[in-house]
Curated annotation (Swiss-Prot):
Similarity annotation: Belongs to the type IV zinc-finger family. Class A subfamily.
Induction notes from the record: In leaves, less expressed in dark than in light.
Motif Nuclear localization signal boundaries: 136-143
Record-level Gene Ontology MF annotations: DNA-binding transcription factor activity; transcription cis-regulatory region binding; zinc ion binding
A single cellular component GO annotation: nucleus
Gene for this chain: GATA3
Gene Ontology biological process terms, A to Z: circadian rhythm; positive regulation of DNA-templated transcription
Pfam families, alphabetized: GATA
Official protein name in the record: GATA transcription factor 3
Length: 269
């Protein structure tokens, strides 16, 4: 690409030199004509009207200039032809790439013109200016205050399981510390707790039913009561009555024996 641009620059310089030489030749011819016009009138005018020699000279000069240009072009071509290795080293490009390169070079040449550069500078300089509209600063609020909902921390399932186990253990400890017992028979296993003489939920189901009907006696005990004794307790109402009678009779006989003892001692006196 660089060699191609250098060749174009050399051709442009040669063309400029040829145009300068032609202009110089025209200036010389005009000076000769002005000098001949200043001669006295004694000379014949016909000799000056014969332009055949001048035309021949001009043709010879033009031929010489063209031959010199051809020689210079041949020299430049020889210079480029003497270096074939540079182009051989370059990779061969397809036709499409060559056409694209030519199109790019044309675009670059067109852009390098002063008119395009002026247009580009004008477009770059003229930028639209937008006036800023005054806006109130936004108040910084948390999302929780806007939504009105609290963000609760996520608790893992393991932590929840551990918390439930701790609550169970605490409940079991409280149950073991305070175990409800029946105030009459002392049992702690009953399907339902009933109201007794001490207060609500102080008697077991069996004792509470008998207390409500008015048949709760000290001799009555359920069979599964921890304080049950066959000698002095029973869970049947008939046997409870028999035990009460025997107990009352025993108490009466005891009282009678105590009363008869002081009479015997008094008879001796």
């Amino acid at each position: 690409m660089e060699l191609w641009t250098e060749a174009r620059a050399l051709k442009a310089s040669l063309r400029g030199e040829s145009t300068i030489s032609l202009k110089h030749h025209q200036v010389i011819v005009s000076e000769d004509l002005s000098r001949t016009s200043s001669l006295p009138e004694d000379f014949s005018v016909e000799c000056f009207l014969d332009f055949s020699e001048g035309q021949k000279e001009e043709e010879e000069e033009v031929v010489s200039v063209s031959s010199s240009q051809e020689q210079e072009e041949q020299e430049h071509d020889c210079v480029f032809s003497s270096q074939p290795c540079i182009f051989d080293q370059l990779p061969s490009l397809p036709d499409e790439d060559v056409e694209e390169l030519e199109w790019v070079s044309r675009v670059v040449d067109d852009c390098s013109s002063p008119e395009v550069s002026l247009l580009l500078t004008q477009t770059h300089k003229t930028k639209p200016s937008f006036s800023r509209i005054p806006v109130k600063p936004r108040t910084k609020r948390s999302r929780n205050s806007l939504t009105g909902s609290r963000v609760w921390p996520l608790v893992s399932t393991n932590h929840q399981h551990a918390a439930t186990e701790q609550l169970r253990k605490k409940k079991q400890e409280t149950v073991l510390v305070f175990q409800r017992r029946c105030s009459h028979c002392g049992t702690n296993n009953t399907p339902q707790w009933r109201t007794g003489p001490v207060g609500p939920k102080t008697l077991c189901n069996a004792c509470g039913v008998r207390f409500k009907s008015g048949r709760l006696c000290p001799e009555y005990r359920p069979a599964d009561s921890p304080t049950f004794s066959n000698e002095i307790h029973s869970n049947l109402h008939r046997k409870v009555l028999e035990l009460r009678k025997s107990k009352e009779l025993g108490e009466e006989t005891g009282e009678a024996s105590t009363k008869s003892d002081p009479v015997k001692f008094g008879s001796k006196w």
